[in-house]
Amino acid sequence: MVKTEFSTNGELLMNTTFEATNSKSRVLIVDDNSRFARSAQLFLEQTGNYVACAVNDPRRALETARSFKPDLVLVDLIMPQADGSEVAAQLEADWALHSVPIVFMTVLITAEEARDGRRINGHRVVPKPPRGFDLIRVVEENLPCCSDA
């Protein structure tokens, strides 16, 4: 089932593919750039290993996470409506979501800085946009079932 929501001005707010299987890891992507969020969602889903949900309004992230129940959340650090730190704080304050790993994405960090293990508020930070298999690597390294952390 595909669920798509648009704002009153036609901007994509959320595009979700829900599947009946529990065997795939669930990744929530929160990014105000709808093209990036949708392409990341499609790329993850095309691997056959993930169910992904893209949210373009960070003010909807908590509500979406509660219904989607992600295994991992990828959050843009800088967004106009609410920044990634605010989104992370909301998720961490929710009893059902507080243990879900969060990874920040930002253009303010280089790949070298990310490899050095830079963190913001205890969360891993990766350069944005992670491309292709770099996105898969970020997801795999941060899923609770797959990471060493």
Where are these regions (language model features)?
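Active-site beta3 strand of CheY-like receiver
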Residues: F68-L74
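Two-component/phosphorelay signaling modules centered on CheY-like receiver
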Residues: S34-C53
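Non-catalytic signal-transmission and effector/linker regions of two-component phosphorelay proteins
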Residues: M1-R26, R131-A149
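Receiver (REC) domain active-site loop signature in two-component systems and cognate sites
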Residues: M79
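Conserved Asp/Asn-Gly motif in the active-site loop of CheY-like receiver
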Residues: V55-R59, G132
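Conserved sequence signature across two-component system core domains
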Residues: V30-D31, V55, V73
